[in-house]
Amino acid sequence: PQGAVLSTGKIDRTRCTTCGNCAEACPTAALVVQGYSVTEEMLFQRVTKEKVFYRDGGGVTFSGGECLLQSEFCAKVLRRLKHAGINTAVDTCGMVERKDLEAVVPFTDTFLYDLKAIDPKVHKRCTGAENEQILENLTYLNKEGANVEVVIPLVKGYNLGEWKKMLVFLKNLERIRTVKLLKYHGFYFSKYEALGWEIPAT
């Protein structure tokens, strides 16, 4: 309806409003909407059905995208999971408002915190965003005594020169106990192709 689906079969993402009408109208089902809406109760019931698998340290991880962009919803479900005795984790890049973290801290056993760069220019070049809020939120979690596992993806040509700076920064956060360096992988290639994006050279 917005002219986002072109005659070539490609999609102009700048025109897409994510209404889903094109997928509904597609006669061959070549266009599909990924994902669906759930209520707090629906998600809680679905997750607790699997409770038997959460023994011996297993649990539920909220991730995304950025799950804390829906922090109020996450907090409600996390609270119920904690009361049900299920271990909880939140995977975040930290690019959220402080109130979003504050909402989930009491109900989160572990934070998986992505850290991509210390130098703000490098971070902006890699992600398109500044990192001041990310570093401030990580410092906040440290002060709160949260259990944080820092995850650092290393990509040649992007942030490989940042890893020492990141470790120096983390050394000053005395409660951070775990840091994982992740080697670059191509798991996201299929997502880029589905979106019609060019896969960056590495």
Spans of model-derived segments:
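Cysteine-centered iron-sulfur cluster-binding motifs in ferredoxin-type domains/subunits
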Residues: 1-2, 10-29, 66
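Inter-heme linker and motif-flanking segments adjacent to c-type heme-binding CXXCH motifs
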Residues: 4-7, 31-34, 53, 73
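Poly-acidic low-complexity segments
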Residues: 6-7, 11-12, 50, 119
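A signal for specific C-terminal beta-sheet/loop modules enriched in small/flexible residues
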Residues: 7, 23-24, 53, 141
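Short N-terminal micro-motifs specific to bacterial/archaeal maturation
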Residues: 7, 13-17, 34, 65, ...
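Conserved AdoMet/S-adenosylmethionine-binding subsite of the radical SAM
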Residues: 41-194
